[in-house]
């Protein structure tokens, strides 16, 4: 009897083993992780935090590096290596809200410009990504010997002509290729022409003549846009130095170098902060 029971149990065990071998074990499929493609020119080490209602006088966009709040003007380096610069997008292409880095507020957040208590907008969309070069400053105490105009007390502006729309508050690598010397109400307001490092045409554009070849007529469009945008508000057209010419890359890099040096003097205290800008 005992022998029969043991034989029966042995047979049952062999049956279960055979069943496990015959039926494959089901493994739950790996969970899909949706990847997000980020432009290689975007510097993802920085993030932004928005405070206050959008489209309001209280709205501010602050920058963070990890958990730490940082100033996009002071703590993001100007030079990115390999001939590239960092720039901060304030106004994405095909938008009209006049956003700017608030250089007189702690941590220099992005805010919308205000005039007579009202938020400012361009009369029409800007057709390029527009922003600023960190760690640069156009010194209002320095008059350009050739142009006879002093700096406008702001970081240097960037007009990024690439195909893709940037995002407000994005930090990107760009290649500078030229510069326009805009004179706005008697103040010198350099407009650096640049292209995003990951634009399909970036490798082809290394100087002004390359831009004219691969983006024919684009620099003239930039000049005309900035020349005329105040006219709908009843103001005169802006002027440009050097006979409206876009200066070459060598000249551009010298402008960037000089405005970076002016910034360093301001930040270090070698130049008095008589404009009461925020240096934190």
From Swiss-Prot:
Enzyme class label: hydrolase
Listed Gene3D superfamilies: Inorganic pyrophosphatase
Residues noted as binding Mg(2+) 2 in the record, renumbered to the chain: 157
Keywords noted in UniProt: Chloroplast, Hydrolase, Magnesium, Metal-binding, Plastid, Transit peptide
Disulfide-bonded cysteines: none
One GO location term (cellular component): chloroplast
Subcellular location: Plastid, Chloroplast
Record's comment on post-translational modification: The N-terminus is blocked.
Principal subcellular localisation of the protein: plastid
Record-linked PROSITE patterns: PPASE (PS00387)
Superkingdom as given in the UniProt entry: Eukaryota
Recorded catalytic activity of this chain's protein: diphosphate + H2O = 2 phosphate + H(+)
Residues in the signal sequence: none
EC number from the UniProt entry: 3.6.1.1
Keyword Lyase in record: no
Membrane-spanning ranges: none
Annotated residues for binding of Mg(2+) 1: 152, 157, 189
Subunit details: Monomer.
PANTHER family recorded: INORGANIC PYROPHOSPHATASE
Protein name listed in UniProt: Soluble inorganic pyrophosphatase 1, chloroplastic
Gene behind the chain: ppa1
């Amino acid at each position: 009897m005992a022998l029969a029971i043991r034989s029966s149990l042995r047979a049952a065990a062999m049956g279960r083993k055979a069943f496990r071998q015959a039926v494959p074990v089901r493994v739950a499929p790996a969970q899909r992780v949706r990847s997000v493609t980020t432009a290689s020119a975007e510097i993802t080490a920085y993030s932004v935090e928005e405070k206050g209602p959008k489209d309001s006088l209280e709205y501010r966009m602050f920058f963070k590096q990890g958990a730490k709040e940082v100033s996009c003007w002071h703590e993001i380096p100007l030079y990115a290596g390999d001939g590239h610069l960092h720039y901060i997008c304030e106004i994405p292409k095909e938008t009209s809200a006049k956003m700017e880095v608030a250089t007189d507020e702690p941590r220099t957040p992005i805010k919308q410009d205000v005039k007579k208590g009202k938020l400012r907008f361009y009369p029409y969309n800007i057709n390029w990504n527009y922003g600023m070069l960190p760690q640069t400053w156009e010194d209002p105490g320095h008059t350009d010997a050739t142009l006879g105009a002093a700096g406008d007390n702001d970081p240097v502006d960037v007009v990024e002509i690439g195909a893709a729309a940037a995002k407000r508050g994005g930090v990107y690598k760009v290649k500078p290729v030229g510069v326009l010397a805009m004179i706005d109400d008697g103040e010198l307001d350099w407009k650096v022409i640049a292209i995003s490092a990951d634009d399909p045409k970036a490798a082809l554009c290394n100087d002004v003549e390359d831009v004219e070849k691969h983006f024919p007529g684009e620099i003239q469009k930039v000049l005309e846009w900035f020349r005329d945008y105040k006219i709908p508000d009843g103001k005169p057209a802006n002027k440009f130095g050097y006979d409206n010419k876009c200066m070459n890359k060598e000249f551009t890099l010298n402008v960037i170098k000089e405005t970076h040096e002016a910034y360093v003097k301001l930040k270090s205290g070698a130049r008095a902060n008589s404009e009461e800008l925020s240096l934190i």
